[in-house]
Each structure stands twice: as structure tokens, then as C-alpha cells.
């Protein structure tokens, strides 16, 4: 398993870091087999897996439950788990308690928090307590209501400078990496140049230190709207629906199960049970 120091070395060597989300055992197992460097158990599971309209309803218990499954599927991959909405805002004590639960109960290697300003103090407190923290700036889904929807952030000089300053504060507070979402490619490149920690982009251009995408988005699985920054490498949803429809048809036509899928009893046992009569 890679350690957090390995990601610093990858940045220094110019080797892109590959991160993908996973929310359950099979997806984590496949991600590890594919050779990803990091897995993010994102609170996006609220929308992707649990069917919520946003990430807001997701709880610490949800994150622990899903991370435990991911750890079982990917025992040798560095796992980052989101701290969900309002689990690190009320007080440092509450943030520490929730982070402790995630780290101890789920098997995560690090936690991720969104935003800057007052969150920077939480990053510092968690780091001081020995919890590795990944920061998340740009489009932060937990704050989408405040941001006015799912929009590109940092498009003008003033807001871009604010994001760059925020990133530097997160780094100074002890963050081990930064997820940068939905910003102009120029800002992504500047962040990667000016920060010593790895900058992992999602819609932040190609010149950052790594990329992260949502598992279901890149595989075309259960998604209705694909963000501009997503490249779909497959469309397994169509394959799944076709397979299920074929199963339905076969059962309705009594074409499944076939002899190859059934079990038989020895004739003498059948005679002993029913006297040779059909049951």
C-alpha cells in the first residue's frame, strides 16, 4: 500500500496520481485490480448509491459503513473518506470525535474536508491529533446551496486568488493533499506549481498532479447527467439493462433455468419418495 509520503514523491517525480471513488466491496476490488493509487469514499455516495438529491443527508455512520466495505475490497490501497456535512463544523472536539470514529472503525487512511476559512482550523486540529487530512476546494458539493449550484469556481481574478490563498492556508495547516474541483485549467496548473502537496483535480485541467472521477460516471453506470469534465470509458448501464431484460424474458418463456442450471435426484430415490409418480 502506498503511504502519504509516496504521493509527495509522485508529485516531485511528475507521475500523475490516479484516484477513483468506490462505495462498496465489488467496486473497490475492481479499482484495486485496475491499479488505482487512491480510493475516495466520497459523500457523493448519497446521490450515487443512496438516491438522495444531494450529499447533505449523508451521516458519519453512512461513511463508516461504506468505507468498511471498500477496505475489505481494497486491502492494499490508500483510502480517503469524506467527513460528511456538519460533521466537522460545530467544534474541534466534534470534528476530532467524528474523525476518530472514521479512522478507527472504517479502516480509512485519511479523511477529506471541504472548504477553507474556519475549516482551516479544523485541518490544523485534526493534523495535530495525527489524522491525515485531504482538503477540498473549488466546487464543494456540501456548500452547493451557498455557491449557487454546480458551477465552475474561480473564473475571475478575485475569486481565483481567494482559492489560491485558501489552498496555501490548507497546506500550511497540514493537509496532505488537495482535491480541486471544477475550476479553470489555468488555476489548476497554478495550484500544482505553487503548492508542495499533491493537487488532485476533478474538472481542473490536465496540469494538476492527479485526477479523480466518480466510479459510476466514468463507467456509465446509473447516471443520467454526465458533467463536462467526465470522460466515460464504458457504458455498462446499457449492458446491465440488456442482461436483466434477457433474464426477464427467459423466465417468462420458461427458457431459464436450462438443464445445465438444474439439479437431479437419483431415480431410485425419487421412486422411494413418490413411488415413481410425477410430483
From Swiss-Prot:
Its cofactor is Mg(2+). The gene is panB. Its EC number is 2.1.2.11. This is 3-methyl-2-oxobutanoate hydroxymethyltransferase. 3-methyl-2-oxobutanoate binds at residues 43-44, 82, 112. InterPro entries: Pantoate_hydroxy_MeTrfase, Pyrv/PenolPyrv_kinase-like_dom, Pyrv_kinase-like_dom_sf. It catalyses: 3-methyl-2-oxobutanoate + (6R)-5,10-methylene-5,6,7,8-tetrahydrofolate + H2O = 2-dehydropantoate + (6S)-5,6,7,8-tetrahydrofolate. GO terms for cellular component: cytoplasm.
Amino acid at each position: 500500500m502506498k503511504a502519504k509520503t509516496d504521493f509527495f514523491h509522485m508529485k516531485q517525480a511528475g507521475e500523475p496520481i490516479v484516484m477513483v471513488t468506490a462505495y462498496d466491496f465489488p467496486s473497490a476490488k475492481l479499482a484495486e485490480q485496475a491499479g488505482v493509487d487512491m480510493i475516495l469514499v466520497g459523500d457523493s455516495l448519497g446521490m450515487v448509491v443512496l438516491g438522495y438529491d444531494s450529499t447533505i443527508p449523508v451521516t458519519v455512520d453512512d461513511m463508516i459503513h461504506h468505507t468498511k466495505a471498500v477496505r475489505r475490497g481494497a486491502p492494499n490501497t490508500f483510502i480517503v473518506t469524506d467527513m460528511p456535512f456538519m460533521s466537522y463544523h460545530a467544534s474541534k472536539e466534534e470534528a476530532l470525535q467524528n474523525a476518530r470514529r472514521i479512522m478507527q472503525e472504517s479502516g480509512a487512511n485519511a479523511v477529506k474536508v471541504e472548504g477553507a476559512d474556519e475549516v482551516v482550523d479544523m485541518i490544523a486540529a485534526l493534523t495535530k491529533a495525527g489524522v491525515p487530512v485531504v482538503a477540498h476546494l473549488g466546487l464543494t458539493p456540501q456548500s452547493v446551496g451557498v455557491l449557487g449550484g454546480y458551477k465552475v469556481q474561480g473564473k475571475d481574478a478575485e475569486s481565483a486568488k481567494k482559492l489560491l490563498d485558501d489552498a496555501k492556508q490548507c497546506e500550511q495547516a497540514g493537509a496532505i493533499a488537495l482535491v480541486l474541483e471544477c475550476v479553470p485549467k489555468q488555476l489548476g496548473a497554478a495550484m500544482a506549481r505553487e503548492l508542495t502537496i499533491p493537487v488532485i483535480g476533478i474538472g481542473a485541467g490536465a496540469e494538476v498532479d492527479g485526477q479523480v472521477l466518480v466510479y459510476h460516471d466514468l463507467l456509465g453506470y446509473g447516471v443520467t447527467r454526465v458533467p463536462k469534465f467526465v470522460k466515460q470509458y464504458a457504458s455498462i448501464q446499457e449492458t446491465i439493462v440488456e442482461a436483466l431484460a434477457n433474464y426477464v424474458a427467459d423466465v417468462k418463456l420458461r427458457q431459464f433455468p436450462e438443464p445445465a442450471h438444474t439439479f437431479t435426484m437419483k431415480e431410485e430415490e425419487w421412486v422411494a419418495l413418490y413411488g415413481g409418480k410425477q410430483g
